[in-house]
């Protein structure tokens, strides 16, 4: 049981931690050469604008070959390239922005994330499968100081007002951070009882100051924010409703800066869902930093000691609507996909009401057993009391057995020493 559990975690974390191997298996830098194909079951080549994935049909190393039809890439389930059944490798070749791949910006890199899914289905009229379902995260990292394009970057000295008229898009990011908030979390694994530290950011370059808000967040077992089951973390234009329950989830006060917003979420997993992983999708938006927070643009947490809501900044009145669950008319439904809007020409004439929005996903967050939960250990290794009781029970059984044997032998001896005469 322990071996299969470790194999499951290895398949999920291959290339992300040192649980299975000291070096990542398929996390390659842009332009890096890939290792020998005979060593690894999955190889990834991050090219200038495309992603190439090569999967060995002996994916699990058991000799049981998988079928190419059972493999897909990304949330949009892109199919592999057509290949001969006799080939030992299944190949994918897609654009970096295809198949639903997500892009995040860190301090030093552009990160494109996706996953390889092996979902075996019964063949013909059979109702069984002989291989396991596996979801393998894949990342391509490109240094921000470099240029992934073959065309040179030309400097521009356009002021912000001109950039607004050019309808420039801003860059949003959502990252998992270490507990001290000083660095990005290296491993996506958590124990129940931990808190996930999330940091939302807006990258604006040298433009005028902007203030970032988390409008709403939802957790799902897949990268699709419309999947079921789901759990709402932030709602009603900035109310961190996850803190209403038995969780201590809250926004961090004060925020590091107007362009950054940090918050913690007590980790969880969906009941009756064997995947033990979640993805968190947040709808981020910005306003001008000089604009005061209001009911539509706020960051509010719930305080259990005072049984009230409080904001990261601004008047406490802007959080009162969190109690009613009605904080104004939403720009779009929380559960509907949203495409990043652009700065409009008409809105730029009145910049006080201009906002920019985007949906950003982070994950998977993978959950192990509870901290301090020794049920598995108790199941595997009996406690001292159990050992004593087991020993006493065995001693009683042995004693009763010996007593029965002695009684039988004694009766036979008595019968042999007093034979019954036929004449009598």
Curated annotation (Swiss-Prot):
Pfam families reported in the protein's UniProt record: Zona_pellucida, ZP-N
Topological category with respect to the lipid bilayer: Single-pass type I membrane protein
Disulphide bond pairs: 46-140, 78-99, 217-282, 239-300
Cytoplasmic side of membrane: 409-424
Signal peptide: 1-22
Family: Belongs to the ZP domain family. ZPC subfamily.
Listed name of the protein: Zona pellucida sperm-binding protein 3
Gene symbol of the encoding locus: ZP3
């Amino acid at each position: 049981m322990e071996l299969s559990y470790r194999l499951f975690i290895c398949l999920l974390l291959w290339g992300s931690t040192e649980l299975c191997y000291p070096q990542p298996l398929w996390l390659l830098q842009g332009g890096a050469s890939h290792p020998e194909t005979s060593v690894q079951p999955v190889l990834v080549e991050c090219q200038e604008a495309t992603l190439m994935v090569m999967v060995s049909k002996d994916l699990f190393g058991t000799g049981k070959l998988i079928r190419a039809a059972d493999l897909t890439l990304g949330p949009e389930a892109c199919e592999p390239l057509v290949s001969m059944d006799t080939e030992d490798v299944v190949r994918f070749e897609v654009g970096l922005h295809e198949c639903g791949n997500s892009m995040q910006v860190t301090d030093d890199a552009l990160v494109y994330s996706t996953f390889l899914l092996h979902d075996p289905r019964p063949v013909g009229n059979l109702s069984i499968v002989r291989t396991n379902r596996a979801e393998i995260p894949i990342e391509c990292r490109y240094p921000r100081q470099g240029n992934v394009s073959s065309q040179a970057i030309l400097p521009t000295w356009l002021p912000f007002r001109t950039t607004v008229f050019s309808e420039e898009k801003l860059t949003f990011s959502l990252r998992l951070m270490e507990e001290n908030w000083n660095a990005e979390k290296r491993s996506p694994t958590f124990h129940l009882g931990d808190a996930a530290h999330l940091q939302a950011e807006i990258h604006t370059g040298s433009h005028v100051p902007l203030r970032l808000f988390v409008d709403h967040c939802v957790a799902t077992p897949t990268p699709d924010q419309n999947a079921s089951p789901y759990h709402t973390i932030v709602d009603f234009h900035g109310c961190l409703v996850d803190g209403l329950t038995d969780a201590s989830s809250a926004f961090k006060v004060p925020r590091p800066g107007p362009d950054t917003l940090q918050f913690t979420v007590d980790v969880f997993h969906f009941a009756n869902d064997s995947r033990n992983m979640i993805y968190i999708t947040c709808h981020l938006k910005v306003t001008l930093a000089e604009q005061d927070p209001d009911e539509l643009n706020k960051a509010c947490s719930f305080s259990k000691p005072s049984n009230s809501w409080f904001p990261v900044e601004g008047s406490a009145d802007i959080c009162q609507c969190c109690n009613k669950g009605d904080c104004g008319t939403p720009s779009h439904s929380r559960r509907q996909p949203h495409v990043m809007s652009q700065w409009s020409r008409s809105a730029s004439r009145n910049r006080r009401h201009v906002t920019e929005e985007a949906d950003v996903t982070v994950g998977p967050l993978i959950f192990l057993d509870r901290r301090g939960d020794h049920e598995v250990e108790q199941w595997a290794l009996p406690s001292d009391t159990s050992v004593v009781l087991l020993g006493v029970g065995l001693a009683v059984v042995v004693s009763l057995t010996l007593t029965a044997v002695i009684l039988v032998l004694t009766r036979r001896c008595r019968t042999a020493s007093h034979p019954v005469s036929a004449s009598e």
